[in-house]
Amino acid sequence: MKPSIQSRLEQLVERFEEVNALLSDASVIANQDKFRDLSREFAEIEPVVKCFQAWRQSLEDIDAATELAKDGDADMREMAEEELASARARSEELDEELQRLMLPKDPNDTKNVFLEIRAGTGGDEAAIFAGDLFRMYSRYAEKRRWQVEVLSENEGEHGGFKEIIARLSGDGVYGTLKFESGAHRVQRVPETESQGRIHTSACTVAVMPEADEAEAVEINKADLRVDTFRSSGAGGQHVNKTDSAIRITHLPTGIVVECQEERSQHKNRAKALSLLASRLQNAELEKQQKSMAETRKSLVGSGDRSERIRTYNFPQGRVTDHRINLTLYKLDEVIAGDLDAVVVPLQQEHQAELLADMANEQQ
């Protein structure tokens, strides 16, 4: 391990002990915000510190086994050599694990997200596919114990959605779903197709981290046009009786957001403003990512909505992620919400890219 990394890890151990002590301090416990921030920091540092301590222990085990191997007794030497081989293997594994744990963290990974799905080419079939995708993400969210809150929906004439926007909240939502942004393509025989021909349709998916209040983009009220209209969504007897739905247009950028799911105009307005702040922040993030991509092409992290990232082929029961050449013949499971089969390989590929970058920087 490089001395610079070891020095950084030793500083982390000191900080870990400091945070641990602070979490027992009565004044910190009384301050909910500070206690929450320190608890989050403790949870982030703990696995790194534990791994580093185990790695240092493995070095001590190597030294002890090396000394023991010098013993004149043949049985003792044999036992020491076995322990030495085991300790070295353990040390290498822990070294690799530490490198992974030391990779730069995306500060957005822990955030909630706004998920936007829009039907693209393919008319009614694209809208039906948008519905399938939303159901897939909803079922996956259920498995992860995330909350799903629909903010706006525009239903297709024959089912599904022309557009649907939802907020997903829970542990690590953005870190899990951030590689879902892009164009998703479906190949299947529509129910209305009498000739049995396979049609190709597409939807675009955008996953945006929810902007924190502290870092939200400042929005000048003079830059906004706010329109009210009658909700067209579900709601039984309350639908269309009041202009509770909100549409906000950000005049400098032309970005338009809507929220119509609440009966209260104030709640719809607050949610629409939150979505607008995230859209504006995401536009800035995309600009930065584009700039970074010019210097280093990332396979999985570009987040370009126009980029075709995945194909769902129903006749063959196949899902293909084009960025990492991943092909799975388990379409039914994936579309039913078993997204880990796709998400985990994408995260591993991204991790491998970061490790390669780290290795290049250390050369």
UniProtKB/Swiss-Prot annotation:
Gene3D superfamilies: 3.30.160.20, 3.30.70.1660, 6.10.140.1950
Signal peptide boundaries: none
GO cellular component, one term: cytoplasm
Top-rank taxon, per record: Bacteria
Record PTM text: Methylated by PrmC. Methylation increases the termination efficiency of RF1.
InterPro entries, per database record: PCRF (IPR005139), Pep_chain_release_fac_I (IPR000352), Pep_chain_release_fac_I_sf (IPR045853), Prokaryotic/Mito_RF (IPR050057), RF-1 (IPR004373)
MF term (GO), any: translation release factor activity, codon specific
A Pfam family recorded for this sequence: RF-1
Protein's cellular compartments: Cytoplasm
SUPFAM superfamilies attached to this UniProt entry: Release factor
Cytoplasm found in the keyword field: yes
N5-methylglutamine, modified sites: 237
PROSITE patterns on file: RF_PROK_I
Record keywords: Cytoplasm, Methylation, Protein biosynthesis
Similarity comment: Belongs to the prokaryotic/mitochondrial release factor family.
Functional note: Peptide chain release factor 1 directs the termination of translation in response to the peptide chain termination codons UAG and UAA.
Record's protein name: Peptide chain release factor 1
Organism in which the protein naturally occurs: Marinobacter nauticus (strain ATCC 700491 / DSM 11845 / VT8)
